[in-house]
Amino acid sequence: MQTSQFASVDWRGNAIRIEYQWVGSADISKPLIVFLHEGLGSVAMWRDFPHQLCIAANCRGLVYSRPGYGKSSPRKRDEHWQVDFMHRQAFEVLPSLFRALNIDTEKQKPWLFGHSDGGSIALLFAAKYVQDTSGCIVLAPHIFVEDVTVRSIEKAKLTYETTDLRQKLARFHDDA
């Protein structure tokens, strides 16, 4: 994968750093696919999948790590995200990233490719900004919160706190 770049994005009155990479075609006239990672994901965890897909589809791609993931600005230790965190990512962070990268979604409507949390964020963005989206490709999005999901998050948290999962994630996330 390529070297990450960083964009400064204004979010909730704070300047945050967003890690991103351009992949696939370098031709800006080609369709754009934006990749939105899952709940423990980041730019690095996608590996070369976005690049390979964009080459096969003759598209350019934007892969980024949401705030609190990868090499983007870490979440404050005492910060607890509310249940609307995916809405905030879709309605606040993603449009701010597009502005920071000079992506005019009215002129070039991106395709959104999201996995899990990223799939939910893609669907939320596309529902609100229908006129600014070519379409969505989603894998295992969360349409509603299920008890099994809440239990799985609690189990993952315990695993993170009691095993070497923190060390394994550290190579993908600056604040693991």
Question: How should each PLM-predicted stretch be described?
Answer:
Residues 21-75:
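Conserved HGGG/HGGXW glycine-rich cap/lid loop of the alpha/beta-hydrolase fold
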Residues 32, 60, 109-111, 135:
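Structural signature of beta-strand start/N-cap positions in the alpha/beta core
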Residues 47, 95, 123-127:
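Short, hydrophobic alpha-helix immediately C-terminal to the catalytic nucleophile
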Residues 63-111:
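Active-site loop/oxyanion-hole signature of alpha/beta-hydrolase fold enzymes
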Residues 1-17:
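N-terminal cap/lid segment of alpha/beta-hydrolase-fold proteins
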Residues 152, 170-176:
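Hydrophobic, aromatic-rich cap/lid helix
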Residues 114-116:
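Conserved alpha/beta-hydrolase "nucleophile elbow" surrounding the catalytic nucleophile
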Residues 123-128, 132-164:
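Flexible "cap/lid" loop of the alpha/beta hydrolase fold
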